[in-house]
From Swiss-Prot:
The protein's assembly and partners: Interacts with TamB to form the translocation and assembly module (TAM).
Superkingdom of the source species: Bacteria
UniProt organism field: Haemophilus influenzae (strain ATCC 51907 / DSM 11121 / KW20 / Rd)
Subcellular location: Cell outer membrane
Endpoints of the signal sequence: 1-22
One GO CC term, this protein: cell outer membrane
Pfam families in UniProt: Omp85 (PF01103), POTRA_TamA_1 (PF17243)
Taxonomic lineage from the root: Bacteria, Pseudomonadati, Pseudomonadota, Gammaproteobacteria, Pasteurellales
Membrane-traversing stretches: 265-276, 279-288, 297-306, 309-317, 327-336, 347-356, 361-370, 387-395, 406-415, 428-437, 444-453, 500-508, 514-523, 536-545, 549-557, 569-578
Purpose of the protein: Component of the translocation and assembly module (TAM), which facilitates the insertion and assembly of specific beta-barrel proteins into the outer membrane.
InterPro entries: Bac_surfAg_D15 (IPR000184), D15-like (IPR039910), TamA_POTRA_Dom_1 (IPR035243)
Name this protein carries in UniProt: Translocation and assembly module subunit TamA
């Protein structure tokens, strides 16, 4: 019997070691703290307390006091106090209110941040030191930690791989409510690039070296390596690039291996589309991204539609000095067009030199030769032209295939003279500018303008493709494609020597990827710039930001047309809007 009694006692003692299942009996509310971040951080710490502890007891109040202290310390409040008040609520758990008195805040009394080693002369570190907090601001632990991280990250980005903090302290004086930053960072020496090698490349090393933005002996900079992953693919010679740096602590150098994966030797592109101006059209492109070890390439394109057909092949020769930005293009092409009162066949040859600069501008200059056989209105002729051409372009786009921001600038200058065996003399200048901007996400504005000037003694000797016509999509909507131009006595289109078109379009997003549009266009294709030659059109439309680009549908009509035209024109198109 005694043994049985002892067993029961032992069982009772064992069970008593485990607390009964606790239950939340109060809700907590913290009051008296100002500042969104301080409130959020304090609430976060309080909410980390297990719900089973929320019974309103002194133990729970102690846990809340500690949580409040942790939440406020990081913002410079080291002497906070908490007074608790418990309120009963009918039909709800009691409410425990924590009345917090943060106390006097601790403020920064001084910052002592020193840089030793080669980084002491580095302007980037000096710039970082200018961002220290000013005396008198509240001390925040996160600001201190972020600054330390910024120094460490900058050191790694700029090649100070041996850098370390000899001193890093946040000193607090609760009695005086003051704080001091103490940091001493020893950067050591800055590493430099060592051997730079290429692997798997089909292009000669001397061409690749002139694409590099670094050379052996240059100071290390991580951004340089990031640029390489975009520079080499932009040549179209490679499908992908892998940059592998190897840090050598003994020699204080960084060897770089650039692994290049060549593109396939042949690439084909097929496309089918529809537009009101050209109807159904198809396109076939064939490209050889690289032909030899000097990076020469060939691209060809065939375009077919009812009114227009083109075939063009271009041979590109990059220059050794700067293969990405300096190159020659040699092109041969054929074009046929039968539209309105135009029937033309053209054979073209060109040799152009291109220069690309760091600001996005592309300049070109060279020679063009063309043989035209054409009928325009009632005149049939053949002509051979040889003329120099120069120009420049710039394209800036953001937002993918349906740009939210961007602009395109173009200008060309052509000069033909009989003195160099060209059958017609002329001067032609043509410039265009297009802009797209998005405001407050839902408001989009597209603006375009184009001007052209052709000086010649006899426009009938100039091929139709060099004359000016207006009307249609991307010109003056409300009119048919190339229907605006001077006419002869028989009412047939001749083409003009002056061109001016403008367009302003407003779009509003009515649904994700869907935009309603309204627009007004104006322009002329004439023999002089006069107000009476201007044509106006206005309309409305819909835009769909599809994965392959903008698909649009427009309805437009002329305004105050001098021929009293009231025709309504419909436009359907696919592609970039500028």
């Amino acid at each position: 019997m005694k043994k049985k009694s002892l067993k029961l006692t032992a069982l009772f003692l064992a069970l008593s070691c485990f607390p009964a299942f606790a239950e939340q009996t109060v809700d907590i509310e913290v009051q008296g703290i100002r500042g969104f971040r301080a409130v959020r951080n304090t609430d976060l710490n309080v909410n980390l307390i297990n719900k089973e502890e929320m019974d309103g007891s002194e133990r729970y109040q102690h846990l809340v006091t500690k949580a409040v202290d942790r939440g406020l310390r990081v913002f410079g409040y080291y002497e906070s106090s908490v007074r608790f008040e418990r309120k009963q609520r009918q039909g709800k758990r009691d409410l425990l209110i924590a009345h917090v008195t943060p106390g006097e805040p601790t403020k920064i009394a001084g910052t002592d941040v020193q840089i030793e080693g080669e980084a002491a002369q580095d302007e980037n570190f000096n710039a970082l030191r200018k961002n220290l907090p000013k005396d008198g601001v509240l001390v925040e632990h996160q600001t201190y930690d972020d600054y330390k991280t910024a120094i460490s990250r900058l050191a790694l980005n700029r090649g100070y791989f041996d850098g370390n903090f000899k001193i890093s302290r946040l000193e607090i004086s609760p009695e005086t409510h003051q704080a001091w930053w103490r940091m001493l960072f020893d950067s050591g020496v800055r590493y430099h690039y060592g051997n730079i090698t290429f692997s798997h490349s089909q292009i000669r090393d001397d061409y690749l070296n002139n694409i590099l933005n670094i050379k052996s002996g240059d100071p290390y900079l991580m951004n340089n390596l990031s640029d390489l992953t975009s520079d080499f693919p932009s040549s179209n010679w490679f499908s992908s690039v892998l940059v592998q740096p190897n840090v050598n602590h003994k020699s204080k150098t960084v060897d770089v291996e650039i692994i290049l994966y060549p593109r396939k030797k042949n690439a084909m592109e097929l496309g089918v589309g529809f537009s009101t101006d050209g109807g159904v059209h198809g396109q076939i492109g064939w490209t050889k991204p690289w032909i030899n070890s000097r990076g020469h390439s060939l691209r060809s394109n065939l375009y077919l539609s009812a009114p227009k057909q083109t075939l063009e092949a271009t041979y590109r020769m990059p220059l050794l000095k700067n293969p990405l930005n300096y190159y020659y293009d040699f092109a041969v092409g054929w074009e046929g067009e039968k539209e309105n009162d135009t029937n033309t066949r053209v054979l073209t040859l060109s040799a152009l030199r291109y220069w690309n600069n760091a600001h996005g501008w592309q300049y070109f200059g060279g020679l063009r030769m063309r043989y035209d056989s054409f009928t325009q209105a009632d005149i049939t002729d053949k002509t051979l032209l040889l003329y120099p051409t120069v120009g420049f372009t710039r394209t800036r786009l953001r937002g993918g295939s349906f740009a939210t921001w961007g602009d395109v600038q173009k200008i060309t200058f052509d000069l033909s003279k009989r003195i160099w065996l060209s059958e017609s003399s002329f001067i032609k200048v043509q410039a265009s500018s297009a802009w797209v901007r998005t405001y407050a996400e839902n408001h989009r504005v597209v603006a375009r303008a184009e001007i052209g000037y052709l000086h010649t003694k006899g426009i009938e000797k100039i091929p139709p493709t060099l004359r000016f016509f207006a009307g249609g999509d991307r010109s003056v909507r409300g009119y048919g494609y190339k229907k605006i131009a001077p006419k002869n006595r028989n009412g047939k289109l001749v083409g003009g020597s002056r061109l001016l078109t403008t367009s302003l379009e407003y779009q509003y997003q009515v649904y994700p990827n869907w935009w309603a549009a309204t627009f007004a266009d104006s322009g002329l294709a004439a023999d002089n710039y006069t107000a009476k030659e201007l044509r106006y059109g206005t309309g409305v439309g819909v835009r769909w930001a599809s994965p392959v680009g903008a698909i649009k549908f427009d309805i437009a009509t002329p305004i105050r047309d001098k021929d009293n035209s009231k025709n309504i024109q419909f436009y359907i198109g696919l592609g970039t809007e500028i």
